[in-house]
From Swiss-Prot:
This is Pre-rRNA-processing protein IPI1-1. Residues 27-38 have a biased composition (Polar residues). Coiled coil: none annotated. It comes from the Eukaryota. Residues 1-38 are annotated as: Disordered. Keywords: Nucleus, Ribosome biogenesis, rRNA processing. It comes from Candida albicans (strain SC5314 / ATCC MYA-2876). InterPro entries: ARM-like, ARM-type_fold, Ipi1_N. Component of the RIX1 complex, composed of IPI1, RIX1/IPI2 and IPI3 in a 1:2:2 stoichiometry. The complex interacts (via RIX1) with MDN1 (via its hexameric AAA ATPase ring) and the pre-60S ribosome particles. Belongs to the IPI1/TEX10 family. GO terms for cellular component: nucleus; rixosome complex. It is found in: Nucleus. One of its GO terms (biological process) is rRNA processing. Component of the RIX1 complex required for processing of ITS2 sequences from 35S pre-rRNA.
Length: 366
């Protein structure tokens, strides 16, 4: 009897238990429960970003929120400008354009977040950024003057970018700056913009390579340009026309403002004691500058060479005209004439640029 009982107990260890329907297998004796439950504590009223928006139940606070997005919403939307999806970045820019805040203090964060998108690889994102910048400058006219330095930095980087599509739209951003900024501020970047424009168009600034320049221009249109190169060059020349008109032609609005100031002055010679509009009004007199004749100067030693451009201030109109006449005009006219020979719209835009440069240099010589 004892042997049969032991034999049955041993067989139980190797026998498979038959489970009833709806019942789970019995857990072993050494089973350890590893499941756990977590609890979270949410305190939205103590959030730093939305502390001024939560709990605003008064009528005044509700009216202020209706004029634009709250700080928390705006911060979240600006964080999406770095999203990996191009559609998300474009939708954020469209949202910001339709929900521009009334509070001027918010625009510093907005400009800091959207300006790097000038170098965005997606074309639709850059188009949305153009319309957003135009809307911002129309709503806040003096904002561009505060962020002009960083904006010009990104535009110059786009003009010399390795990706052709980014270079194509770079001058369109510059056109927005030219249309919305004051001339005195954009004039200080005249030399840098002209140098990058030569790089963008594939023109050489070295006078020693002038003999090989015509061959370089003809091969450039065949090898270095893509299928949409002609349309891109037309856009570049149109924007160059506006830039040259802004920086090389006399601003008539300043004369109107001066006439208005003279109408309200007490004495006829009061204008002599008023503050000037230029940053360095006596810079052309060169009172505190010791000049040395450079090798690239003209025959009479009064010309401006490429080495002088690094130390010359371009706030003065006559200085910009002299720089154009001595440095940029000869090579620019030679390259623009190649576009004139092509005819069509690109020939008309090149002719307009030539007329502006010629007129400015003629007036400066007089």
């Amino acid at each position: 009897m004892a042997s049969k009982r032991k034999r049955k107990e041993k067989q139980k260890d190797f026998a498979k238990a038959k489970l009833k329907v709806g019942k789970t297998a019995q857990k072993p004796d050494n089973y350890t429960d590893t499941s756990f439950k977590s609890k979270t504590i949410s305190l939205p009223n103590q959030s730093i970003a939305s502390s001024s928006n939560y709990g605003a139940s008064s009528g005044a606070s509700r009216s202020s929120l209706s004029t634009g997005p709250s700080l928390a919403v705006l911060t979240h939307q600006l964080s999406l400008t770095k999203h990996h999806s191009s559609n998300t970045r474009k939708e954020v820019l469209n949202y910001l354009q339709t929900h521009l805040p009334e509070n001027p203090s918010y625009y510093k964060n907005i400009m800091t977040s959207i300006l790097p998108l000038i170098l965005d690889e997606d074309k639709e994102v850059r188009k949305a950024l153009m319309s957003l910048l135009s809307a911002i400058f129309a709503k806040q006219p003096g904002l561009i003057d505060l962020h002009l330095r960083s904006t010009i930095l990104f535009i110059l980087s786009a003009m010399s970018h390795i990706i052709p599509n980014i270079r194509t739209t770079s001058t369109h951003f510059l056109r927005i700056i030219v249309e919305n900024s004051h001339g005195n501020l954009i004039n200080s970047y005249f030399v840098k913009i002209m140098r990058n424009w030569f790089v963008l168009m594939g023109w050489s600034l070295n006078e020693q390579d002038s003999k090989q320049l015509s061959m370089a221009v003809t091969t450039l249109s065949i090898t270095a340009m893509n299928a949409n190169s002609k349309q891109a060059r037309i856009g570049h020349l149109q924007n160059l026309n506006k830039f040259l008109s802004k920086t090389l032609q006399h601003d008539q609005d300043k004369d109107k403002n001066k006439d208005m100031k003279l109408n309200i002055t007490i004495h006829p010679q009061s204008y002599k004691y008023l503050l000037t509009d230029t940053v360095q009004p006596y810079q052309p007199l060169k009172l505190f500058v010791k000049e040395f004749k450079s090798e690239g100067s003209g025959s009479n030693g009064s010309g401006i060479s490429m080495l002088d451009l690094n130390t010359i201030s371009t706030e003065d109109l006559d200085t910009r005209k002299k720089i154009m006449n001595d440095v940029f005009k000869p090579l620019m006219i030679k390259n623009l004439n190649t576009f004139v020979k092509e005819g069509g719209e690109i020939g008309r835009e090149a002719n307009n640029c030539i007329s502006i440069v010629t007129q400015a240099c003629t007036s400066s010589s007089e």
